[in-house]
Amino acid sequence: KKVMIQSTRFPGIEMDNQVLDRFYGYGYDRKVSNKMNFDLNLTQKLDFITKGLSIDLKGSYNTDYSYVKTVRGHIETYTPYYKSEVDGSNLAKDDPAFDKTVVYRIAGQNMMKTYGEGNKSRARDWYAEASIRYNREFGDHSVGALLLYNQSKKYYPKQFADVPTAYVGLVGRVTYDYKSKYMAEFNIGYNGSENFAPDKRFGTFPAGSIGYIITEEDFFPKNRFLTYLKIRGSVGLVGNDNMSSNRFLYLPDSYSINDSGWLQQSYSDKNGYIFGMTNTAYMAAARELALGNPNVTWETALKQNYGIDAYFFDDRLKLTADYFRENRRDILMLRTSIPSLISMNGLLKPVNIGKVNNHGYEIDLKWSDRIKDFSYYINGNISYSKNKIIFQDEVEPNEPYMWRTGNEVGARFGFVAQGFYDVDDFNADGTLRADLPQPQGNKKPGDVKCADLNGDNVIDSDDVTKIGNPKRPAYTFGLNFGGEYKGFFASMNWTGVAQCDMLMSNAYMRPFFGSQVLYQYMADGRW
């Protein structure tokens, strides 16, 4: 196959400009992957010891390795010319002796030029679990118990790829049920994470729940209006060891030896401290890079949930409602109230000091029915959730409206816009009138005008306040419905959110920066 270039002036020569032709001789990429997944599940009943007793063993092993083999080639290219253009005759094209025989000059050669391997990825993990279970009924009473041990390890994580992540846990649970009316459950978890120092590595997390089905009581009249009513509640403590990119914060302080970046500029080619005035000498030295935090531990959350389940009209209308609260403590964050001089220029590690409370509700209502061969359902739901920062080691601001503590996580803070500057706001020489609050930067007519909240006639950081809601919506709505008729099914889903704010895209922000202009279509319908 010949690859032609520069042949546009030769209409009779076929052009190699097809999409696939452009890749001819370029080479290829070959992805090689190898995956293996192994799962094991064994159950042994121990009824010969006592009825309802059993043991379970579970395990899994997964491995994945892939790489891309790259081969890049070089090809011959053929450039067409008229013979008289390359034979040295130097004849003009209008000369009768000009030879228009098409000849080709060849450049390069067909060969595979480079080889390589890249984009390597690897993954490996295993999980092991052993449990002993007991479930048995004694007349109207049902009891259950579980004792479970699990352990897992994941290799090649994104951070510290040579150090796998490891977890170990012990779980205990007991359950009780009386006549399917009264239900209770208690469980406790004892979990360990390699993210913490040995004396902080394990955490204990208890939880309990109760339920009461009122419609199972003898005194509750059987009727078609309310066919099922259950009230329930739960409370529990959970732990979180997900530290994102902050693994091993508990390790001792780290140091750098002979770092020249902290010397005077005139001695930037030296390492260490400079001694002397005339016969100067430098000594090798070390400095702290980061301070360890041996007290880093689990982030905890005390969660509560209270709800009801109710069915009406022969179970055609179903209602589920929940109210929840969550008090999250020991959130890992940086301390901001410590001066940088004391805190080693920001080298302090995050500590477990953050506190956030959250509360909300969820309501789900569904109607379903069948009319001969046609069945249908209508389902609507709404959820509300709002959090509040209780503590985040915030430095006391100059103005009370600047506090971020007490607001939602992720609340939008900024300047309050009050329209745009007009030509009447400026003097004849283009400077801003002195009776107006003085902003930072060189403002021009059309720029955004910001509010002077503290009345000091200056627009600065002391005028920053909450201007919007977090990105995460406080309200989430849903409506879905569908129907089925003799094997034909159709459905539709609607979703919506409220009390959330998104930042404008760059296309809408750009006109307000630098020397950009605001187009009329962007201004129409605003303010």
Summary of predicted features, one role per range:
Residues 56-58, 75, 491-493:
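A structural signal for short, well-ordered beta-strand segments and their strand-loop junctions
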Residues 145-153, 183-192, 449-472:
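Catalytic-site beta-strand/loop segments enriched in glycine and acidic/polar residues
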Residues 1-5, 10-72, 81-414, 486:
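Extracellular/periplasmic, surface-exposed regions of secreted and cell-surface proteins
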Residues 65-68, 242-243, 424, 491-493, ...:
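Short helix/loop capping segments that flank catalytic or ligand/cofactor-binding pockets
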Residues 72-75, 335-336, 394-396, 495-498, ...:
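Short Gly/aromatic-enriched secondary-structure transition segments
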Residues 247-263, 370-471, 502, 509-527:
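Conserved small-residue
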Residues 51, 470-503:
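Glycine-rich, aromatic-lined ligand/substrate-binding cores of catalytic
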